[in-house]
């Protein structure tokens, strides 16, 4: 998974004191994993219920995380992080706000820090997933790279994944990118 791959880019010693923000953390799977690995971890999500579950899970494991309830469209970073991370939730950003949002993420990433994202990509040969919401927006292939042309691209891949969300078998196309501020 992208979370573990991102964690592996810093040695255990280098992780101490590093800050990560998980944009769209849901019920906390990845933000808790980052905290387990020594990061100061902050989770952002629109769902109060999801954040409460993340906080309860962290407490049960004796792990400290911070949470902020916000939608991703209006949320902007206001402090620096070593890792800005999101898995599958940047699809809620409409195309017209993306440039400004990614500029904000870049501005508040520390020198040498990482932005690690995966986003759903529209492909004409794949049907729209059955559980795709009206507030979800596809990216085009390689779009993430256009926002990070001035950073080191550590990894970029496009893949097609089998999925069974909503109980209906289907496929997703996804771009995965890890970029480093140099």
Regions found by a protein language model. Give the residues of each.
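A conserved beta-strand element that flanks and buttresses the S-adenosyl-L-methionine
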Residues: 85
């Amino acid at each position: 998974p992208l979370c573990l791959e991102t964690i592996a880019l810093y040695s255990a010693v280098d992780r101490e004191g590093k800050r990560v923000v998980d944009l769209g953390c849901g019920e906390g799977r990845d933000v808790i994993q980052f905290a387990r690995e020594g990061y100061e971890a902050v989770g952002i999500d629109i769902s109060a219920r999801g954040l409460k579950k993340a906080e309860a899970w962290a407490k049960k494991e004796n792990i400290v995380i911070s949470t902020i309830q916000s939608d991703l469209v209006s949320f902007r970073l206001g402090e620096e992080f070593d890792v800005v991370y999101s898995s599958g939730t940047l699809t809620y950003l409409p195309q017209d706000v993306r440039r400004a949002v990614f500029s904000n993420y870049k501005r508040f990433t520390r020198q040498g820090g990482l932005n690690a994202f995966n986003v759903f990509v529209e492909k004409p040969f794949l049907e729209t997933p059955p559980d795709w919401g009206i507030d979800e927006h596809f990216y085009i292939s390689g779009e993430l790279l256009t926002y990070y042309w001035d950073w080191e691209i550590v990894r970029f891949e496009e893949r097609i994944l089998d999925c069974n969300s909503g109980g209906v078998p289907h496929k997703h196309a996804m771009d995965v990118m890890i970029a480093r501020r140099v």
